[in-house]
Amino acid sequence: DDVGGRRSEKTVCIVRYGGFGDMIQTSSLFPQFKKKGYRVCVNVTERGYDVIKSDPNVDEILLQATDQVPNDCLNEYWSRLTKCFHDFIQLSESIEGALLVIPDRTEIIRGKPVLIKGSPRYSLSKEELHEQCNVNYMERTHDLAGVPHEFLPKFYPTKKEKKWARKTKETEIGSNKVVLWSLSGSSCHKVYPWTDAVISEVLSKTKNVSFVTIGDALCQMLEGGWEDEPRVLTMSGEWSIRETLAFLDQCDIVVGPETGVLNAASTLNAHKIVMLSHSSKENLSKHWKNTTTLEPEHYEDFCFPCHKMHYGFDTCKRDEYTGGAMCSVNINAKEIITAILDNSK
């Protein structure tokens, strides 16, 4: 398809595919290029588009369907795109791939499953990988774009979404303090098995707090038993990602694993409680505002932080008792409870 030809005005094209969190991190670049007098064009897939479509720092969006351009044709596609812009920033696999090493995996190319060989670094020792990959994600992103370390990853809700968020808090939540809990991320290690215990303990300790649990439709299984609790609003599969991100401004505390929701909250005043799994504090939350960063306590054959992508438990160490990832299981629930209570007074 036509990609618009050479832009007449000075324009940068920023290419970033992937999930919500990837796009939130990339959004930090947009105001930097606006300061330098660029028009900002973003080449993105549907998931990313949903997050940035209201960003005032974005002038143009090149939207493509996921896998519309086969992976083995991307370099050719990017070479063509480059000619249309005054500056071209290609960020695909700048984090996943470079700082989170990818294993063998199956991808669908032209409608057929194809085994893609993973990085040879996947078999390196934990120490070797840590030395290579313990780099802050935001710093790496800004360095690749050639802009200063002035970080502002941000979601921009519309006026209508802001109004909806305020009204939802007023009508659905009776407590003074609101804790939003992101139940799960995109990998098997991004779900916390002791969530129920933490919520139950906090509710018993204070009458001042209500919880909002969010996630995709599958996360509704994690909300079982809380449907009739007036101080727990179960919204997994009900709220869209934009509604969830718009509601962050109404929250006092945001809890969860390494997800796009936590990334979107990183510069907000709300207190963040992030549970690390495959990333280190240096990688993820080094520059976050008002944040408690939790790491797993030591366990046998300690693998944290692994700096690896996992597409299942064939590569991720699993706890037999809970069925969860060892890194997630061994984050101390008492630390989460304390952080919530201390920041909801």
For the regions a language model picked out, list residue spans one by one.
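Catalytic machinery of carbohydrate-active enzymes
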Residues: 1-345
